[in-house]
Regions:
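Eukaryotic N-terminal low-complexity, Ser/Thr- and Lys/Arg-rich leader segments
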Residues: 1-17
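Soluble catalytic domains of membrane acyltransferases
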Residues: 29-173
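N-terminal nucleotide/polyanion-binding subdomain common to many enzyme families
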Residues: 15-26
Length: 173
């Protein structure tokens, strides 16, 4: 399980700040629809007290999609552990060496192994975090999808396991 603490908080804040700068300097305009409702849900103290987590799902076309999403969120969300996302990352893509492993573990990312099924420690950790009211973000297609169509590939079984086995049914965004 990725360690929490000062190093983890520092890495998450650093990536969020760099992503925000990249979006500000590298994009003419960034528009996020529905972010106010998402932030309200994420910061709702009653939701967290009830142990009702959030599963957010997104398609992605590059490995930059996940960290760049952080740059669109308010800075205040990165001050508390309960409002910072946990994520799953493919072993063969982002955990290629010890430095990457150290960095991504401290960036609140669990290592999943393609082809090894839905009963992996990373999925177990995600279910536990959902039961504690945490936010878990996943890319349910299980790979980068370079298709120009808006059609999603099939979701993986792990998505169902997260939702069905969480102690309290999580919000799904």
């Amino acid at each position: 399980m990725p360690p929490a603490g000062t190093a983890s908080s520092s890495i998450v804040r650093l990536v969020a700040a760099l992503s925000r700068q990249f979006l500000a300097l590298g994009c003419r305009r960034v528009r996020v629809l529905g972010s106010d409702a998402f932030v309200r849900l994420l910061t709702d103290p009653q939701r967290a007290a009830e142990g009702r987590g959030i599963v957010s799902l997104a398609n992605h076309i590059s490995v930059l999609d996940e960290p760049l999403m952080w740059g669109t969120l308010p800075r205040s969300l990165f001050q508390q552990e309960r409002t910072v996302r946990w994520s799953l990352g493919a072993s063969d893509i982002i955990f290629k060496n010890e430095l990457c492993r150290w960095f991504f573990h401290r960036g609140q990312t669990w290592e999943v192994f393609r082809g090894q099924g839905i009963y992996q420690p990373a999925i177990n950790h995600a279910i536990t975090r959902l039961g504690a009211g945490s936010w878990v973000h996943i890319f349910p297609e299980g790979r980068v999808n370079l298709s120009r169509s808006t059609r999603l590939r099939r979701f993986k079984w792990g998505v169902s396991r997260l939702i069905l086995e969480a102690p309290t049914t999580p919000y799904v965004v």
